[in-house]
Amino acid sequence: MDPNCSCSTGGSCTCSSSCGCKNCKCTSCKKSCCSCCPVGCSKCAQGCVCKGASDKCTCCA
């Protein structure tokens, strides 16, 4: 059970608007959580919910 998520891993939850789930790996959640990319990175917004600003974003790799 994720302490920041109202469901157990693989269960049903919503992570669409915020990243309360640490890993956001519930089956009902279509997007994963990651750090926000710097302005100008178009890849980050796809399939990802931003959890905070970061200059080193793995979504951009």
UniProtKB/Swiss-Prot annotation:
Q: Which domain of life is it from?
A: Eukaryota
Region named Alpha: 30-61
Name the InterPro entries for this protein: Metalthion_dom_sf, Metalthion_dom_sf_vert, Metalthion_vert, Metalthion_vert_metal_BS
Residues reported in the UniProt entry to bind a divalent metal cation 2 = C7, C13, C15, C26
Q: Where does a divalent metal cation 3 bind?
A: C15, C19, C24, C29
Tell me if Acetylation is a UniProt keyword of this record: yes
Chain spans, region Beta: 1-29
* UniProt keyword annotation of Nucleotidyltransferase present: no
Q: Which GO terms describe its cellular component?
A: cytoplasm; cytosol; lysosome; nucleus
Record-listed a divalent metal cation 1 binding positions: C5, C7, C21, C24
Q: Which residues bind a divalent metal cation 5?
A: C34, C36, C37, C50
Ordered alphabetically, the record's keywords are:
Acetylation, Metal-binding, Metal-thiolate cluster, Zinc
Q: What GO molecular-function term can you cite, just one?
A: metal ion binding
- Binding-site residues, a divalent metal cation 6: C37, C41, C44, C60
Name the SUPFAM superfamilies for this protein: Metallothionein
- Spell out which residues are annotated as carrying N-acetylmethionine: M1
Can you supply a Gene Ontology BP term from the record? Answer: intracellular zinc ion homeostasis
PANTHER family per the UniProt record, alphabetical: METALLOTHIONEIN (PTHR23299), METALLOTHIONEIN-1F (PTHR23299:SF55)
Q: Please report which protein family the annotation says this sequence is part of.
A: Belongs to the metallothionein superfamily. Type 1 family.
**Function field:** Metallothioneins have a high content of cysteine residues that bind various heavy metals; these proteins are transcriptionally regulated by both heavy metals and glucocorticoids.
- Per the record, what about its domains? Class I metallothioneins contain 2 metal-binding domains: four divalent ions are chelated within cluster A of the alpha domain and are coordinated via cysteinyl thiolate bridges to 11 cysteine ligands. Cluster B, the corresponding region within the beta domain, can ligate three divalent ions to 9 cysteines.
Question: Mind telling me what this protein is named?
Answer: Metallothionein-1
Annotated organism of origin: Rattus norvegicus (Rat)
